């Protein structure tokens, strides 16, 4: 597997709750969007089935996650599970992403037995310093950079300067910038030190996924 920083160039996150604006079955819509995104060049995908409008049946969630995993494997793109460590283990995910209020990273690592790379979310400089010092954390998502409607409980906006601040404090682990990122802002975030950007609605709501992915990758292609 490539170094983790190579996967961060364009990190796509989505679940069925992000596909409700489309007609038809949300699960099938997610699979269709994911396949188009993979064909177009995303470098990592995180299965994030979360919130009141997401699937609630564990069996349906697992079945859909397996379909997403299999699509990612066809394109040799890492498949990451958000928060649900047991699901990640059960279906052989490549990575697991946990927030500050999810399972402790040490517990995640103990369960995964080094089979998954581990990412976490960072919203403050103090969290970034702690993530840098924790050898179990392979990368972290910083944000939200801009206001976002994709999450039900978004943290305070940190702005583009936060990425520069993180780097200025000697934090050199792979960083993916997330939260309201668009084709107009992705390159600026990379210039400030992010290894890449993570998006939800920029792709799920795109009328031309191939074009959007190309623009989000920009000079990182």
Swiss-Prot record:
Its EC number is 2.5.1.3. The keyword Iron-sulfur does not apply. Keywords: Magnesium, Metal-binding, Thiamine biosynthesis, Transferase. GO terms for molecular function: magnesium ion binding; thiamine-phosphate diphosphorylase activity. One of its GO terms (cellular component) is cytoplasm. Binds 1 Mg(2+) ion per subunit. 4-amino-2-methyl-5-(diphosphooxymethyl)pyrimidine binds at residues 46-50, 82, 121, 151. GO terms for biological process: thiamine biosynthetic process; thiamine diphosphate biosynthetic process. It catalyses: 2-[(2R,5Z)-2-carboxy-4-methylthiazol-5(2H)-ylidene]ethyl phosphate + 4-amino-2-methyl-5-(diphosphooxymethyl)pyrimidine + 2 H(+) = thiamine phosphate + CO2 + diphosphate; 2-(2-carboxy-4-methylthiazol-5-yl)ethyl phosphate + 4-amino-2-methyl-5-(diphosphooxymethyl)pyrimidine + 2 H(+) = thiamine phosphate + CO2 + diphosphate; 4-methyl-5-(2-phosphooxyethyl)-thiazole + 4-amino-2-methyl-5-(diphosphooxymethyl)pyrimidine + H(+) = thiamine phosphate + diphosphate. Mg(2+) binds at residues 83, 102. Pathway: Cofactor biosynthesis; thiamine diphosphate biosynthesis; thiamine phosphate from 4-amino-2-methyl-5-diphosphomethylpyrimidine and 4-methyl-5-(2-phosphoethyl)-thiazole: step 1/1. The keyword Metal-binding applies. 2-[(2R,5Z)-2-carboxy-4-methylthiazol-5(2H)-ylidene]ethyl phosphate binds at residues 148-150, 180, 200-201. Its cofactor is Mg(2+). It is an enzyme of class 2 (transferase). HAMAP family: TMP_synthase. Condenses 4-methyl-5-(beta-hydroxyethyl)thiazole monophosphate (THZ-P) and 2-methyl-4-amino-5-hydroxymethyl pyrimidine pyrophosphate (HMP-PP) to form thiamine monophosphate (TMP). Belongs to the thiamine-phosphate synthase family. NCBIfam families: thiE. This is Thiamine-phosphate synthase. It comes from Pasteurella multocida (strain Pm70).
């Amino acid at each position: 597997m490539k170094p983790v920083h190579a996967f961060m160039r364009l990190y796509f996150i989505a679940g069925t709750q992000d596909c409700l604006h489309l007609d038809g079955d949300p699960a099938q819509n997610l699979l269709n969007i994911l396949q188009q995104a993979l064909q177009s060049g995303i470098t990592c995908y995180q299965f994030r089935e979360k919130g009141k409008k997401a699937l609630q049946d564990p069996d349906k969630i697992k079945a859909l996650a397996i379909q997403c995993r299999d699509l990612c494997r066809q394109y040799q793109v890492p498949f990451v599970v958000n928060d649900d460590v047991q699901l990640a283990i059960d279906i052989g995910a490549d990575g697991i992403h946990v927030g500050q209020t999810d399972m402790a990273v040490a517990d995640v690592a103990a369960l995964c037995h080094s089979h998954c790379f581990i990412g976490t979310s960072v919203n403050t400089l103090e969290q970034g310093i702690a993530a840098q010092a924790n050898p179990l954390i392979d990368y972290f998502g910083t944000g939200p950079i801009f206001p976002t409607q994709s999450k039900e409980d978004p943290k305070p906006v940190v702005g583009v300067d936060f990425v520069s601040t993180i780097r200025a404090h000697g934090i050199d682990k792979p960083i993916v910038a997330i939260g309201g990122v668009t084709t107009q802002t992705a390159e600026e975030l990379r210039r400030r030190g992010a290894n890449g950007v993570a998006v939800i609605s920029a792709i799920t709501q795109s009328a031309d996924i191939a074009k959007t992915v190309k623009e989000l990758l920009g000079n990182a292609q």
